[in-house]
């Protein structure tokens, strides 16, 4: 697939036809969810945030809107939508959820479910000052280009853990966020 010419209809068709199999074991029992907001344009965008430098965990990192599943959340999808509204003012009613990717185990002990949703291009994003320092859009075709991600093996407590690194403009995209973007690319058939 030529990444420079990805159109929204092509992305949607590939995502629906190549639906992921979600049956994997996890060591983490605490649930979290992130929203992968795809901006509805002929050539779609990917909405990302940069976390506030004042946060205790993952300060300053590029991330998807998301967080822990609360007792009030009916599902991981509801949690992702709630967090997106809290962090960047995306109303849940504005998100067309098209599916989920297989959960990812975080280094902080959560099983994180990525929820893929389509959002309108004209939403007035408003970053929560406590949690988000920037909201930006990256062309989806660029985000899904696997050649932009570089592996780094980290050794922690005797175990090797691979993370992926990339840059977009002034933003350093790495860790779980880069890994989820790569999984989305592989899900729709992008070849390494």
Swiss-Prot record:
Return the motif ranges for Nudix box.
67-89
* Domain Nudix hydrolase residues, every copy: 29-160
Keyword GTP-binding part of the UniProt annotation: no
Any one GO MF term held by the record is: magnesium ion binding
Alphabetical list of InterPro entries matching this protein: CoAse, NUDIX_hydrolase-like_dom_sf, NUDIX_hydrolase_dom, NUDIX_hydrolase_NudL_CS, Nudix_NudL
Q: Which GO terms describe its biological process?
A: nucleoside diphosphate metabolic process
Question: Tell me, what does this protein do in biology?
Answer: Probably mediates the hydrolysis of some nucleoside diphosphate derivatives.
Query: What is the protein's given name?
Result: Uncharacterized Nudix hydrolase NudL
Protein species of origin? Shigella sonnei (strain Ss046)
């Amino acid at each position: 697939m030529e990444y420079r010419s990805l159109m929204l209809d092509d992305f949607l068709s590939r995502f629906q036809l190549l639906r992921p199999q979600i049956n994997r074991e996890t060591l983490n029992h605490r649930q979290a969810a992130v929203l992968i907001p795809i901006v509805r344009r002929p050539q779609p965008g990917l909405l990302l945030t940069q976390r506030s430098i004042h946060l205790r965990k993952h300060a300053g990192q590029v991330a998807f809107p998301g967080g822990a599943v609360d007792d009030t959340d009916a599902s991981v999808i509801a949690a992702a939508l709630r967090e997106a509204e809290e962090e960047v003012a995306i109303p849940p009613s504005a998100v067309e959820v098209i599916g989920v990717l297989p959960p990812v185990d975080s280094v902080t002990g959560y099983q994180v479910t990525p929820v893929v949703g389509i959002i309108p291009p004209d939403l007035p994003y408003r970053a929560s000052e406590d949690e988000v320092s920037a909201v930006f859009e990256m062309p989806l075709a660029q985000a899904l280009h696997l050649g932009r991600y570089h592996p780094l093996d980290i050794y922690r407590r005797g175990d090797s853990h691979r993370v992926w690194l990339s840059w977009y403009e002034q933003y350093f995209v790495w860790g779980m966020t880069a890994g989820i973007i790569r999984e989305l690319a592989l899900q729709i058939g992008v070849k390494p």
